Amino acid sequence: MRTRRIVATLAALATAVLMSMGLAPEACAQAQINTKKMKIGDFPEKIMKVVLTGNPMIDSVLQDEISSGWRISPYEFCTVEDFEANKGNSEFYFMLLSKAQFKKEDAPGIEFLTVVKGGKGADKGIDEMLEACTFPVRAAQMPSGREFDFLPYIIGAMQGYIQKSMTDDRVGYAGLGKYAAGLGGTAGKKVVFASGDVSKNLPETVKEKALAAGIEIVDDDEADELLGTGDMNCIVSYTVAPSNPEFGSYCYKMLFGAGDHKLYYFRKQSVGRDGDCGFIASEFNKLAAVRR
């Protein structure tokens, strides 16, 4: 009897503490199990429907890359109409391109490749669906065309991120920046920046120091050609930003391994009042530092 009274007292105290925090006891239990890795833990068993856009160029790349390299779940290709008909079905995940508009933007600036789970609330929009991964791909208006070269790398990074998120909530919640290998992983490798990925305000002195450290800045086409070499010791930059960056927009800066397809760096940056975006002096200095 005394033991039962002690247990009952402890339970009452625990309930009181939870209630004082505005939480019901069952909410505490849910908080322990409903983490991202639990929510997407069924990903390997579900079919991922890859939603084709109707654009032959982008659809061809999507089909080729998914068919040749997607390995963490079964998949099939579908139309936008199929997505609309099945988005409420929790038996499916969906990979699709979608444009996003940030709060201070006048119009959507960037197009993302996202993987979401079907289910309740899907009729309210993609933002209400459970997200497994979202990756910036290109400008929403007048994209550069570089996305076709980088899409295989993006899909590879998304696959790796989803797989890691199923075992490590720190990565799942912290995002792609946490998943990336980090600038330290670039030591001993050649890093090549496309000139269009670099801030227009980058001081010449920083460029000179970068060059001395073995970091190159070349034309966009020259940088992108390195992707096809398969060079395991080469890393290439990619920046996704609106075609006309404005204050309140964002850009995304990335470094990919040309040969290993690894994501070495990922960072989201707000666009300043002057519309400038791209890799800045502090990032070049950090890259140079790991080479000393």
What are these model-predicted stretches?
Residues 7-16:
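Sec-dependent N-terminal signal peptides
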Residues 28-112:
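Start-of-domain marker
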Residues 30-41, 122-292:
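C-terminal/domain-edge helix-coil "capping" segments
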Residues 16-27:
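C-terminal segment of classical bacterial N-terminal signal peptides
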Residues 1-7:
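N-terminal secretory signal peptides that target proteins for export/translocation
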Residues 108-127:
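Aromatic/basic-lined ligand-recognition segments
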